[in-house]
Regions:
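Extreme N-terminal tail/first-helix region
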Residues: 1-16
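Left-handed beta-helix
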Residues: 14, 19-20, 25-26, 31-32, ...
């Protein structure tokens, strides 16, 4: 489900895939070949969420922001099932493990494993 919020509509590349019951709200950009899986929520209501090319956000994960803390996910990143990512930066090629929590202001480098 795709929702406009405060006159901001998610921008989803036509080569991306979003599960029918995933929720994407507001200022969210999905680059090409991204995938958002079942029950994931991307809530760009406070700041922008940017998901880089080839990245995936798996089942039940939540991506959110706070004022002053946008969320940037690099290219070819995997966000595992039920992860909570909030107002952070995740570098290219990183893996955020199942159930991981990353909070405001965290900066994860390229090729990292968070678990």
């Amino acid at each position: 489900m795709i929702y406009e919020y405060q006159n901001k509509l998610p921008q989803i590349d036509n080569k991306s895939w979003v599960a029918p019951n995933a929720v994407i709200i507001g200022s969210v950009i999905l680059e090409e070949e991204t995938s958002i899986w079942w029950n994931a929520v991307l809530r760009g209501d406070n700041e922008k969420i940017h998901v880089g090319k080839g990245s995936n956000i798996q089942d039940g994960s939540v991506a959110h922001t706070d004022p002053g803390f946008g969320l940037y996910i690099g290219q070819n990143v995997t966000v595992g099932h039920m992860a909570m990512i909030h107002g952070c930066t995740i570098g290219d090629g990183s893996l955020v493990g199942i159930g991981s929590i990353i909070l405001n202001g965290a900066k994860i480098g390229k090729g990292c494993l968070i678990g």
